[in-house]
Amino acid sequence: DNRLRIGGALDNQGGRLDSRAGNLDLQSGSLDNGAGGVLNSAKGWLTLVTGLFDNSAGVTQAQSLEIRAGQGVRNQQGHLSALGGDNRIVTADFDNQGGGLYASGLLSLDGQRFLNQGAAAGQGGKVGAGRIDFSLAGALANRFGQLESESELHLRAAAIDNSGGSLRALGRSGSTRLVAGGLNNAYGVLESANQDLDLQLGSLANAGGRILHTGNGTFRLDS
């Protein structure tokens, strides 16, 4: 394994930290991997414990990822990917505007806000995983963004804005579950092929939007 411990800031802007064969274990006061920086564990896992993690226009990838960033994650125009396993993130705000967040297995996010919006169609962030499970104390902003799960999609947030965006769960078993104070799906798409679709919402705005359940189980809407 490759281990790096720094009490203060780690500046990897435009640089590379590569582990070609083993794992990569990083701990720092903050980490700046922007401006084309690369954090890569080609055949192993990558763990990161830091304050603010800035991956804007950077690349962070490994077979599996575990990230704890107490002051937030910035991934604008960045790429953050677990190539062969799970991507588990615990943070404050996660800014993925124009960025990509991926996992072959589970993508788990515990945090405050998740910002995945764009100014126009095609400009939002992109999220894709085998399974998605978000638990947010604040809002999930997905205006013109995209969240797509190959199996289940579970989202819990204070509010979800999917106006002009897309939320999709493609698996034929399991469930899609959204729990939020409100869902704005104006001109957006919420599509689930899972057996069950469960929407527990304080309010729902769906003007011009589409909610589609093609599974053979239960479609439940509490609002």
Region roles according to the model:
Residues 1-7, 18-29, 41-51, 61-71, ...:
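Surface-exposed loop/turn motifs in large extracellular/passenger domains
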